[in-house]
């Protein structure tokens, strides 16, 4: 493809025919679709035929994106082409495409992850009545994201930005008949509207400043205005903050992060796509695309890094006590996105994009593996997310789903930062750069790396080690037919927040006659013992997923193993470069402008040793607390060996319980928003309604009623004689003239 840049405009439009054709078919032939349900096997095969062209078209885009990346690595310059849509004397609105290293990186990321998710979804969603609708939404999602990354101006970005938000709304609420899913998609939509409104205001503000929406013109004009001090700096900072607000909402940064855990109500494949390469990546992409704009405003760079470090720590602490496997991974995504924002705020453009790449493949692997786990658990507990996604009911899955276990373990180790897996290289680069930026931020970032290792191995141990805990909850297995249709995924129950959450969620609290209780905070607590191991009953067990679901996981496993190699230096003409650096050259990087091979190698090994040590400490702590020591022993009292009562131990327990209550209840942030914002807005609406009905309507109705009674009084007073009416008329005219005379003269 010698001149592939010239045909890059087709990238967003290649997958577009699929949602159009599926949508037309569902609208024009709804009756035929319902009749096909009478023939389940034929219907399933017919529907799955749509998966092949979907995957094929996205594969074409992937090949095209790879060619663009190769051209960028070989030194191709930025390519832009625009078509004028609206031309006026003072205004010209243009559409086009913009090809640079960032575009090629994002295109490869979207297409590769998208292809694997589509292959996986073919089997995962095969028994769902909404199979075709799901694939239509997924294709539209990929199209919207590809359009976003190839946009050449802010208006075009905003259009595709809204399309990405709409697709996420449709996919999060895919099972819209479930109240939890319907509420989750509304929450995501409303939360993102806040950021989108800020983004729109920021776009209009910068157009008012520069008179252009085009990226290259915008950057050049704005830099000249800043250099010549021809613009009000406070107004510029406000507009840049509004632009950043869009990225905060889309990438689930504090304080607009609350939609991300609830987004797990959607099907697991879409969770993988949202968290790896589409919606949450859009916010990082926006900041990276507008990086030349933000970099000349120091206050905005400080704000970006501050929001990033807060999100890093908050996401990690909220993941500590989650029992839902997908929500635990969701908070993990939030924390890792915080690392990317932190890197961008520090000026480490390369490290941020590198972590975006490595995290995408690792997190896609983890979500697809969690989907395989959920799929296997549904055969036992039924189609209920409260059970199939709850790690309390899992355990011991290592021997039942060995391939999934290996995939999940590799993804977990990568996210923990264990070499030579993908996330080790990118996270270590961010951690190293943090020392150059701020020691306080560095301490928080390094400490959170240990927390990441802890909560990720907590998820792994609760899921795969020990015994299958659902058996001790006395759930019987459920057989499923060869074809079944899922409309309502279980009945919705009211969620009760457990305010007495404890460190060991899988253990039961019992009291034997010969045991003495211990006291914490004035409350008597029972000692922890393991029970129910004597329960004898035959159960069904989880089974490994089909090859269609395992194949994408294995390919993503290979990506997780080897994608970090793009940052390994190679020698070219006496210069030590790597593929990522050649791809991003001459992108801006404030840090590491001068390098020395020996010093860099020494610093790398020193930082790597420190980061791996912190990760290993987190893993060891997770093993200490969650490794099932009771696997071969019945009714073992853990407190006899683990707990030695004393003042220091009681204080430590209080701190642990406080942290876990904070984490389990999402830091009480959702509760705060519910009380302060939701109830406050509803109270204001009720007050406005009362004022409108009682005051505004009261005045209007009062005037009408008063006029009515005055008219009735005059009517009866006059006795229905015309002469009396004429007299009153003349009196009123005289009074009016007298008043007018005194007013005028």
From Swiss-Prot:
GO terms for cellular component: chloroplast thylakoid membrane. It catalyses: a plastoquinone + NADH + (n+1) H(+)(in) = a plastoquinol + NAD(+) + n H(+)(out); a plastoquinone + NADPH + (n+1) H(+)(in) = a plastoquinol + NADP(+) + n H(+)(out). Pfam families: Proton_antipo_C, Proton_antipo_M, Proton_antipo_N. It is found in: Plastid, Chloroplast thylakoid membrane. It is a multi-pass membrane protein. GO terms for biological process: ATP synthesis coupled electron transport; electron transport coupled proton transport. Signal peptide: none annotated. Its EC number is 7.1.1.-. GO terms for molecular function: NADH dehydrogenase (ubiquinone) activity; quinone binding. Keywords: Chloroplast, Membrane, NAD, NADP, Plastid, Plastoquinone, Quinone, Thylakoid, Translocase, Transmembrane, Transmembrane helix, Transport. The chain crosses the membrane at residues 9-29, 50-70, 99-119, 135-155, 157-177, 194-214, 229-249, 268-288, 290-310, 337-357, 364-384, 406-426, 435-455, 550-570, 610-630, 724-744. Its main location: plastid. NDH shuttles electrons from NAD(P)H:plastoquinone, via FMN and iron-sulfur (Fe-S) centers, to quinones in the photosynthetic chain and possibly in a chloroplast respiratory chain. The immediate electron acceptor for the enzyme in this species is believed to be plastoquinone. Couples the redox reaction to proton translocation, and thus conserves the redox energy in a proton gradient. Belongs to the complex I subunit 5 family. NDH is composed of at least 16 different subunits, 5 of which are encoded in the nucleus. This is NAD(P)H-quinone oxidoreductase subunit 5, chloroplastic.
